């Protein structure tokens, strides 16, 4: 039997798909790639935008049309957040949410045996436990992603994720550390702690993210630890100083911004101001002292009520911080969120224009930030081999580089001197 997966959305979704692939493989299935024939087609959906829902439905419709005898599965955040709507999508033989993922295999086997269509979407509940879905292999044999938390307790005006993912649920430290030991033994040198709300780790279990990072750093063989997205309001001075003391922690912080304008942040129902965000950045820089540190972020433009002045203020804030990378998103009006009904919606054409302008600002800031690192040294984890001795990789600061490394191999960490940015990567040379 062959099964084909299609994944939309975040790194957590990719991690969960990897776990499902592992589960199906262990039970005799072969993983088919896109475009190949299969007996089962599974879409792990993302519901951050209405467009994501449409992409999931479109993919399954096409697979059902091309493979009328195959079993089709709609799982993930879309059916979890909008169960009644998803249940009416008849091209899916199995519709299930993002809880009890291991039951997907059992239900698929029932359908292969002739069972009628199955809809199995259980709502998230307070007090439910983290679902263990370990992954043993990743696309590249260099960086591993470990899911340590699920759920979000926040209520941002534009976001449907709390509805899709439920309340905060933390994975047990013992389970995380056991997986880390397995990954180290398999040759992985860098791990990324991923989550839906990473700084919320431990809120439900009496521990915290800093303690987890400190324990992860003690695992032999793991040389670099990287953090997923962080909310600035949850980073206290003590939290920051303890993180800065962990040598294995990569000094690259993805601090969720969403807007550099305080008025817009308030409408978004974010719980910090632009000034408070900037203060956290300065606290992190102060904690690292003379050691270099980098910042990446996400920013939304065209949120309801955002004036031209608000937008310019947000762009100026990007320059003020000096981000290494900014992921810019035009606001997507998501049904099921408070912001969907907000007045003063921005016209789509204006949102796209603001997005183009902000991307240009972000790219200029990126060039200036990378220019400041030219001539400095850093360590690079060699990843994809190109032609001959050329490798791509990332520094501890998450600077993408290309370097000639004769005699080296993928997964090796080497020290390099950073050169010029070519618009895609920084040219580097071995020290």
Report residues per predicted region.
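Proteins enriched for Cys/Gly/acidic motifs involved in redox and nucleic-acid/cofactor modification
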Residues: 1-200, 238, 249, 253, ...
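Catalytic cores of alpha/beta
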Residues: 83-87, 235-242, 303-320
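Conserved glycine-rich "GG(E/T)P / GGGxP" loop and the immediately following alpha-helix
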Residues: 47-52, 188-215, 219, 231-238, ...
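Charged helix-capping and loop-helix junction motifs
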Residues: 57-59, 173, 206-212, 273, ...
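Conserved strand-turn element in the central/C-terminal portion of the radical SAM core barrel
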Residues: 155, 159-166, 198, 224-233, ...
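Radical SAM/AdoMet-radical enzyme domain recognition
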Residues: 185, 210-211, 218-224, 235-297
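Terminal RNA-binding accessory module
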Residues: 341-431
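Hydrophobic, well-ordered secondary-structure elements that form the walls
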Residues: 255, 298, 318, 326, ...
């Amino acid at each position: 039997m062959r099964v084909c997966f299609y994944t939309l959305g975040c790194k957590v979704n990719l991690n969960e798909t990897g776990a499902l692939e592992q589960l199906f493989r262990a039970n005799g299935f072969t993983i088919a790639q896109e475009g190949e024939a299969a007996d089962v087609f599974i879409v792990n959906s993302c519901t951050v935008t209405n467009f994501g829902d449409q992409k999931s439905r479109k993919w399954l419709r096409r697979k059902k049309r091309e493979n009328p005898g195959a079993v089709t599965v709609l799982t993930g955040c879309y059916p979890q957040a909008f169960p009644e709507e998803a249940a009416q999508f008849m091209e899916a033989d199995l519709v299930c949410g993002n809880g009890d993922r291991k039951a997907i295999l059992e239900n698929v086997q029932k359908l292969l045996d002739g069972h009628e269509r199955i809809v199995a979407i259980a709502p998230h509940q307070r007090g439910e436990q983290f679902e263990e879905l370990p992954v043993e292999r990743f696309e590249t044999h260099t960086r591993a992603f470990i899911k340590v938390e699920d759920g979000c307790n926040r209520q941002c005006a534009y976001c449907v994720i709390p509805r899709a993912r439920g309340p905060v649920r933390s994975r047990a430290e013992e389970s995380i550390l056991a997986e880390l030991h397995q990954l180290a033994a398999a040759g992985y040198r860098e791990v990324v702690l991923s989550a839906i709300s990473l700084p919320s780790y431990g809120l439900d279990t009496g521990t915290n993210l800093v303690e987890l990072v400190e324990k992860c750093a003690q695992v032999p063989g793991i040389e670099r630890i990287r953090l997923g997205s962080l909310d600035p309001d949850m980073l206290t001075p003590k939290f920051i100083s303890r993180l800065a003391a962990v040598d294995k922690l990569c000094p690259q912080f993805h601090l969720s911004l969403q807007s550099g304008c305080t008025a817009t942040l308030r409408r978004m129902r974010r719980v910090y101001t632009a000034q408070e965000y900037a203060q956290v950045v300065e606290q992190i820089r102060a904690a690292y002292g003379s050691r270099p540190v980098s910042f990446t972020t996400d920013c939304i433009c065209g949120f309801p009520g955002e004036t031209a002045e608000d937008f310019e203020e947000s762009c100026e804030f990007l320059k003020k911080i000096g981000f290494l990378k900014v992921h810019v998103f035009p606001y997507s009006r998501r049904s099921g969120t408070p912001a969907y009904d907000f007045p003063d919606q921005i016209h789509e054409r204006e949102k796209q224009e603001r997005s183009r302008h902000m991307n240009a600002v972000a790219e200029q800031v990126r060039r200036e930030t990378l220019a400041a690192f030219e001539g400095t040294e850093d360590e690079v984890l060699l990843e994809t081999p190109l032609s001959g001795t050329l490798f791509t990789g990332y520094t501890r600061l998450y600077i993408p580089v290309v370097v000639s490394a004769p005699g080296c191999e993928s997964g090796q960490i080497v020290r390099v001197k950073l050169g010029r940015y070519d618009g895609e990567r920084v040219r580097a040379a071995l020290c």
